[in-house]
């Protein structure tokens, strides 16, 4: 059973009134949009409670389609009678001829990637991993029962709430499947498919062995380009005819091969994520995208020391055959039964009073004033920037190098 939400289900989302809100700062810029920390300057009841506003320009048919889908997913999560505490809700949304904008609760703890790298040794202890993975499992389980495959699980997309619990974010790459309770394989639509002939050509190029990955902490790259043919994407039409979605170090073998994929891709990504939390690096990272994909297809994850319940969980999640992967038959129920989660009260996860990390409150930033989001958007449109986009949701003030964890 999934944990009960800490508050009753919200009412249907409202229309976002950009005239009544001001942005306090930019939380992050990405390839598809900008995220602002904002507050309501009109309503006294909400002016002290900041929220995040994501603004996505309608620059292409692809961005328009993904923005609409993300808003739709958030809307479904918000009106769900069994709202999940580890998934966001849509506060309000707005559409203009130039852009989409929507508001979600602000997560003051930043993302899991920043938190992981701030640790002295760059890794989490087993108890901390258990805490975060348990909540992520519940979030994925909820999405899967709704018929949604997440398909973009990575530390950067796991936000830390003020309470210390997690929230998944960014649903533009998710996919609705037809049979939520008994997942079946499907063939991706033309935008997401890898040409099978090129996939076979790529398979002939890879060698049967892979070098040991001794690289340091990663900086993820989105695998939204064709790994076989490096031709530039045509953004004029908004179509990417030979592409697939995900982040290269987290992409599952069946996606690389161009096979149909289902909910099992999320359990594979959970295995990669858990490995990274344990060792500070992903298990298949290579010196290039091609080598990374070769490792995903051919290499087995390497573990230090003796096998234990945690490594058993990771091994089962990183089975390359999706039909034998942990979670492929009964979903999250199979994962919850493993010895690593022995003693976990799945229905009481939100009742843990002291999560491993509790963000410092930044109430000092919640002052009157701010800037107009629309004016900032117009400046971005008219002023080209040579600087690369900064990672989303990684505010530098969130946590410091020696922020301690509270074990539970």
Swiss-Prot record:
A Pfam family matched by this chain, by name? Pkinase
Q: Which InterPro entries match?
A: AGC-kinase_C, Kinase-like_dom_sf, Prot_kinase_dom, Protein_kinase_ATP_BS, Ser/Thr_kinase_AS
Q: Which UniProt keywords apply?
A: ATP-binding, Cytoplasm, Kinase, Nucleotide-binding, Nucleus, Phosphoprotein, Serine/threonine-protein kinase, Transferase
Q: Does the keyword Transport apply?
A: no
Active-site residues, record numbering mapped to chain: 152
| Domain AGC-kinase C-terminal positions | 342-408
Report the top EC class in one word.
transferase
Query: From which domain of life does this come?
Result: Eukaryota
Where in the body, by tissue, does this protein show up?
Expressed in the epidermis and cortex of the transition zone of the root apex. Expressed in rosette leaves, stems, flowers and siliques.
* E.C. numbers: 2.7.11.1
List each copy of the Protein kinase domain by range. Answer: 21-341
Record's catalysed reaction(s): L-seryl-[protein] + ATP = O-phospho-L-seryl-[protein] + ADP + H(+); L-threonyl-[protein] + ATP = O-phospho-L-threonyl-[protein] + ADP + H(+)
| Matches recorded under SUPFAM superfamilies | Protein kinase-like (PK-like)
Gene Ontology molecular function: ATP binding; kinase activity; protein serine kinase activity; protein serine/threonine kinase activity
Q: Without the gene, what phenotype results?
A: No visible phenotype under normal growth conditions, but the double mutants ucn-2 and ucnl-5 are embryonic lethal.
| Location relative to the cell | Cytoplasm; Nucleus
* SMART domains assigned: S_TKc (SM00220)
Q: Under the cellular component aspect of Gene Ontology, which terms does the record hold?
A: cytoplasm; nucleus
Record-annotated residues binding ATP?
Answer: 27-35, 54
Q: Which family does it belong to?
A: Belongs to the protein kinase superfamily. AGC Ser/Thr protein kinase family.
Q: Which PANTHER family match?
A: FLIPPASE KINASE 1-RELATED
The job of this chain, per UniProt, is described as: Regulates planar ovule integument development.
Which protein, by its recorded name, is this?
A: Serine/threonine-protein kinase UCNL
Q: What organism is recorded for this protein? A: Arabidopsis thaliana
């Amino acid at each position: 059973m999934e944990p009960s939400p800490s508050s009753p289900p919200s009412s249907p989302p409202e229309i976002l009134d950009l005239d009544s809100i001001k942005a306090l700062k930019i939380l992050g810029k990405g390839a598809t949009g900008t995220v602002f920390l904002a507050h309501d300057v009109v309503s006294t009841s909400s002016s002290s409670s900041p929220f995040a506003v994501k603004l996505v320009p309608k620059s292409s048919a692809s961005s328009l389609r993904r923005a609409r889908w993300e808003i739709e997913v958030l809307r479904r999560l918000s009106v769900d009678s069994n709202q999940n505490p580890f998934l966001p809700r849509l506060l309000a949304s707005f559409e203009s001829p130039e852009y989409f904008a929507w508001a979600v609760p602000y997560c003051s703890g930043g993302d899991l990637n920043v938190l992981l790298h701030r640790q002295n040794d760059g890794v989490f202890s087993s108890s901390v991993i258990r805490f975060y993975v348990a909540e992520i499992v519940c979030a994925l389980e909820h999405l899967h029962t709704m018929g949604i495959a997440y398909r973009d699980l990575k530390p950067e997309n796991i936000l830390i709430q003020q309470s210390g619990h997690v929230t998944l974010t960014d649903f533009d790459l998710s996919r609705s499947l037809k049979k939520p309770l008994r997942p079946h394989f499907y063939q991706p639509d033309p935008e997401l498919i890898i040409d099978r002939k090129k996939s076979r050509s790529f398979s002939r190029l890879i060698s049967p062995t892979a070098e040991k990955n001794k690289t340091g902490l990663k900086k993820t790259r989105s695998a939204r380009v064709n790994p076989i043919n490096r031709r530039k994407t045509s953004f004029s039409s908004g179509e990417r005819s030979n592409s697939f979605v995900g982040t290269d170090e987290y992409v599952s073998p069946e996606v690389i091969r161009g096979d149909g994929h289902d909910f099992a891709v999320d359990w594979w990504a959970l295995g990669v994520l858990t490995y990274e939390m344990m060792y500070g690096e992903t298990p298949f990272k290579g010196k290039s995208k091609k080598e990374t994909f070769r490792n995903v297809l051919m290499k087995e994850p390497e573990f230090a020391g003796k096998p234990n319940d945690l490594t058993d969980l990771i091994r089962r999640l990183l089975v390359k055959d999706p039909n034998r992967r942990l979670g492929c038959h009964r979903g999250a129920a199979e994962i919850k039964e493993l010895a690593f989660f022995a003693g976990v009260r799945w229905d009481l996860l939100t009742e843990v009073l002291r999560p491993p990390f509790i963000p410092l409150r930044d109430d000092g930033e919640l002052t009157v004033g701010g800037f107009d989001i629309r004016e900032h958007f117009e400046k971005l449109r008219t002023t080209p920037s040579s600087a690369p986009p900064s990672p989303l949701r990684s505010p530098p003030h969130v946590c410091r190098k020696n922020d301690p964890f509270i074990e539970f």
